[in-house]
């Protein structure tokens, strides 16, 4: 397989190689936390990986923590990716992502006595976010 350069990515990379990007965060205070944000493009398809780990001065505020995409999407989509929300105590929760043309919102799946349903992620849902808690997003989408 030969490599080919993809124009207008903001970084020089061969097709299929991972590229780091710096997303804009909303309802997330980075503080001394860490972000891993990378993607790779093959044709019009983007594979994205994002992980945020809270430090002692980090926080989740408001509802639906959000980060910007590295390249705008061709479509808006609901539940087009999967998220894992990890509490420092070892508990893990299944999350979902909703995408606009330029951003990703993080939600969580919640169970009641009968159903599993989607809920808003916030400073206290699915747990109260503290140091070493994290969320990881894996998703694919199509660019314009």
Please place each PLM-identified region on the residue numbering.
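Glycine-rich, low-complexity segments
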Residues: 1-32, 74, 136-144
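N-terminal compositionally biased, intrinsically disordered segments and leader/signal-like regions
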Residues: 13, 27-30, 62, 67, ...
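Generic short beta-strand segments
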Residues: 22-26, 49-55, 112
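Sterically constrained small-residue positions within well-ordered secondary structures
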Residues: 30, 39, 60, 97, ...
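Beta-rich globular "head" domains
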Residues: 32-92, 136-142
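Conserved, charge-rich beta-strand/loop surface module that forms ligand/interface-binding patches
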Residues: 76-144
């Amino acid at each position: 397989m030969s490599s080919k350069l993809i124009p207008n990515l903001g970084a020089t990379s061969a097709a299929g190689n991972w590229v780091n990007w710096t997303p804009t965060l909303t309802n997330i205070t980075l503080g001394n936390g860490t972000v891993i944000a990378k993607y790779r493009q093959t044709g019009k398809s983007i594979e994205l990986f994002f992980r945020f780990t809270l430090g002692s001065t980090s926080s989740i505020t408001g509802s639906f923590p959000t980060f910007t995409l590295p390249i705008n999407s061709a479509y808006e989509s609901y539940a087009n990716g999967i998220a894992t929300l990890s509490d420092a105590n070892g508990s893990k929760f299944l999350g979902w992502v909703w995408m606009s043309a330029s951003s990703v919102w993080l939600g969580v799946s919640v169970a009641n006595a009968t159903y599993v349903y989607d809920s808003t992620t916030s400073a206290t849902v699915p747990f109260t976010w503290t140091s070493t808690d994290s969320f990881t997003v894996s998703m694919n989408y199509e660019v314009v």
